[in-house]
């Protein structure tokens, strides 16, 4: 394709532009664009780059705070962590590429998010991920899991950055669109942050990193479209990563910054050279002129269109200070990187591209950068689920005799095990009878079976198979990771007593049932997870994953989820400093469950005071912080045991969240607690089982809160923590809880080798561990 080729509305549509958008281009230019210019417009106006459907609503987020140095709008967010140091972090999606080509899609997602962080002057110190796959029985799921996990581990391990936390879910709603959200956290000096805005005209523009190839062309456009049955044909739009080149790029970039030569810098991510050059010039209010013949190329005969839209990985664009080209050349040569001066900033306000002696693009930057189309799309209020009365939700049965483990559990090593539900009832003494238990398999399910089934379900079961493929301890600063029994990863700030706590969270089934409450809960759970390791929650990044925003019901999910998240951020003093929006996650008109993922960072001033849920000791007292109502709507129990996905999610009272979290954090700082676990999926009984397994100590609960036993044990009420403390600390707890006005309930004690509730069940730790550890390896090792 040449610059002389005629552009048509059909070509614009092929590039992802709507007819009204093409008409807008004609009006702005007062002429027809050539194919190169049209390609530039198409990627800069894509949903992926412009946020044209969501930008109106993203403004609801609070983005400032006492620790915020830089909020949304740059490559990543920056927060102050004291002592002249800053934490730089962001989360971003690589959903569409990972479905098409799972290994490279996931690997380049990791590489891209690291570049966002070190582009601002930070050394990456931690990686996280949030993964959503389809139903385990779907024919593509196992291959996608294998490829994505290998890609994440293969890239992060080679670069030498530990993967310390994350979450993995399975649901049929992701059969046609998996989600791969990657997060990176880095450290920098607070007074040495680098930004992307070009400071003035007349400065050299330098390309460095890997050569440009034809991989990833129109990747940003592909990420702004839904899939259909021909999705595999989009494989050429997936980028190919080289982690060893990334490692060299990190070192060269940080050395270049330390030399004082950098005036502005931007990585080449989505839309490649187009977005990096347009954003740098646009933010600085200058023009930019590039000589594409000077761009390092790994393939012959590349056109201007291909070079501008390529998304080849491990590339950077820098604007250097006057006369500093030689410094850059020396550093790039040292690290073996391709590099060239490919242009300059100008006073014209135009994007000018030259190739083979011709001007192949000459368009104003304004409509590309700050005058892209913005839509106020129509939306409708989501249809909400009614609240479920826990007394009307079936309970497990006592089974034969006492119910103390009398029936064998479902075979947890069956890799294609579908959750089973059964028939009978059980109530606590003070609750009305519950209805018969309608198990889909037609068999009665006991308490023992229900608990083992939940522990072995794909969303809860140990992901050891997965995280053992990640290097969690490279850099030697990891204090808590996926293996240590904690609600958040914890990484030491090297050479100090400080540590950063990091987590990623979302409960899609809550957002599906009520986007507003689900949005609040995603933020609140991230806040709880940081609290549960002893950290002060500071700020969040987000990754908003939704379907097609042109459908009013999907746009309604987006609007209300953002509303809920924004309210939670304000109430918890938890500003949003960076983020990403991934839309059009649907195939043949079937959208994913709405998944607004939250990545969060907290600070421990003394990492010696960190805590997890694996420190339980025999004789410790188990205490539940927070009130128990027994909310079973949209719960894991309802889905995995009863085969239902209905009911309103548990409501989130943000004032109560803050009160209870502040109480727990204060108790941790006083050194009173042995173990802390926030309550989430599966409620109290799963939190107790996970604490017992991590600590290798049993628990016995002989005094449950009031209510139907199954609602008390499986209910997912929010703002709750399970804590363990010595007997002699109870008086201090009572005083602190009284001062805070926070309810608590003494449940029982630690000891023995069972998880037991008086008069209901007792399950040996070995059986619990077999259920918890068995599903994932059995699934991944099963024949295809």
Enumerate the language-model features and the residues they cover:
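Non-catalytic terminal/interface segments that mediate subunit docking, oligomerization
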Residues: 45, 49, 58-108, 112-118, ...
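Mobile "lid/hinge" segments at catalytic clefts and subdomain interfaces of large enzymes
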Residues: 74-341, 345-350, 354-355, 369-370, ...
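N-terminal amphipathic, basic-rich helices that act as targeting or association modules
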Residues: 4, 8-80
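Glycine-/charge-enriched secondary-structure boundary and capping motifs
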Residues: 2-15, 19-21, 25-38, 177-178, ...
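Alpha-helix N-cap/helix-start motif at coil-to-helix transitions, marked by capping-box chemistry
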Residues: 16, 243, 655-658
């Amino acid at each position: 394709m040449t610059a002389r080729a005629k552009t048509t509305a059909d070509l614009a549509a092929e590039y992802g532009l709507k007819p009204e958008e093409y008409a807008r281009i004609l009006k702005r230019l007062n002429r027809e664009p050539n194919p190169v210019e049209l390609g530039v417009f198409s990627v800069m106006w894509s949903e992926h780059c412009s946020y044209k459907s969501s930008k109106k609503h993203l403004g609801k987020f609070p983005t400032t705070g006492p620790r915020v140095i830089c909020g949304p709008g740059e490559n990543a967010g920056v927060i102050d962590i004291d002592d002249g140091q800053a934490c730089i972090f962001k989360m971003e999606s690589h959903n569409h590429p990972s479905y098409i080509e799972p290994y490279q899609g996931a690997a380049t997602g990791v590489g891209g998010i690291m570049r966002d962080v070190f582009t601002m002057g930070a050394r990456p110190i931690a990686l996280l991920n949030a993964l959503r796959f389809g139903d385990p029985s779907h024919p593509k799921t196992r291959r996608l899991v294998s490829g994505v996990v290998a890609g994440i581990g293969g890239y992060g391990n080679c670069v030498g950055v530990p993967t310390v936390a994350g979450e993995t879910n399975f649901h049929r709603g992701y059969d046609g669109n998996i989600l791969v959200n990657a997060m990176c956290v880095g450290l920098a000096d607070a007074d040495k942050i680098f930004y992307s805005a070009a400071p003035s005209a007349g400065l050299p523009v330098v390309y460095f990193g890997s050569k440009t190839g034809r991989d990833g062309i129109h990747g940003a456009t592909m990420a702004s479209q839904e899939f259909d049955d021909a999705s595999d044909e989009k494989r050429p739009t997936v980028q190919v990563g080289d982690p060893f080149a990334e490692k060299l790029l990190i070192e060269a970039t940080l050395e270049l910054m330390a030399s004082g030569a950098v005036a502005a810098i931007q990585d080449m991510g989505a839309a490649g050279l187009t977005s990096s050059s347009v954003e740098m010039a646009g933010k600085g209010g200058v023009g930019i002129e590039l000589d594409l013949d000077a761009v390092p190329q790994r393939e012959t005969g590349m056109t201007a269109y291909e070079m501008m839209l390529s998304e080849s990985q491990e590339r950077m664009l820098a604007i250097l200070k006057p006369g500093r080209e030689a410094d850059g050349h020396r550093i790039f040569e040292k690290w073996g990187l391709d590099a060239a001066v490919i242009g300059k900033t100008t006073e014209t306000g135009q994007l000018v591209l030259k190739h083979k002696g011709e001007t192949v693009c000459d368009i104003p930057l304004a409509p590309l950068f700050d005058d892209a189309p913005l839509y106020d799309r129509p939306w409708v209020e989501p249809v909400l689920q009614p609240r479920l009365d826990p007394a009307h939700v079936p309970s497990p049965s006592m089974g034969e005799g006492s119910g103390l483990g009398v029936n064998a559990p479902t075979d947890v090593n069956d890799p294609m095990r579908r959750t089973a539900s059964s028939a009978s009832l059980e109530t606590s003494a003070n609750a009305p009878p519950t209805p018969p238990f309608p198990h889909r398999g037609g068999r009665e399910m006991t308490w023992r079976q229900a608990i083992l089934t939940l522990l072995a379900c794909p969303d809860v079961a140990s992901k050891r198979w997965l995280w053992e493929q990640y290097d969690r301890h490279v850099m030697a600063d990891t204090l808590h990771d996926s293996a240590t029994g904690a609600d958040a990863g914890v990484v030491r700030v090297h050479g100090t007593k400080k540590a950063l706590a990091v987590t990623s969270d979302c409960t899609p089934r809550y957002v599906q049932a009520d986007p507003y409450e689900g949005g609040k809960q995603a933020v609140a759970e991230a806040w709880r997870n940081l609290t549960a390791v002893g950290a002060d929650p500071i700020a969040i990044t987000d990754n908003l994953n939704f379907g097609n925003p042109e459908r009013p019901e999907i746009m309604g999910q987006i609007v209300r989820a953002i509303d809920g998240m924004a309210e939670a951020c304000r109430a918890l003093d938890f500003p949003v400093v960076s983020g990403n929006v991934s839309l059009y996650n649907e195939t043949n008109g079937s959208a994913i469950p709405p998944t607004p993922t939250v990545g969060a960072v907290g600070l421990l001033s003394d990492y010696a005071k960190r805590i997890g849920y694996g420190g339980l000791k025999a004789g410790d007292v188990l205490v539940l912080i927070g009130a128990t109502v027994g909310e079973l709507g949209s719960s894991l129990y309802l889905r995995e045991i009863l085969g239902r996905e209905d009911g309103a999610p548990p409501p989130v009272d943000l004032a109560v969240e803050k009160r209870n979290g502040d109480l727990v954090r204060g108790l941790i700082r006083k050194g009173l607690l042995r173990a802390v676990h926030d309550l989430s999926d599966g409620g109290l009984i799963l939190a107790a089982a996970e604490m017992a397994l991590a600590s290798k100590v049993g628990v016995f609960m002989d005094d449950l809160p009031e209510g139907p036993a199954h609602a008390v044990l499986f209910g997912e009420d929010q703002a709750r923590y399970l804590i363990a403390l010595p007997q002699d600390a109870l008086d201090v707890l009572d005083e602190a809880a009284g001062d805070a006005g926070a309810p608590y309930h003494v449940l029982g004690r630690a000891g023995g080798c069972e998880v037991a509730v008086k008069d209901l069940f007792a399950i040996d730790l070995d059986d619990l561990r077999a259920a918890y550890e068995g599903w994932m390896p059995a699934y991944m090792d099963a024949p295809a």
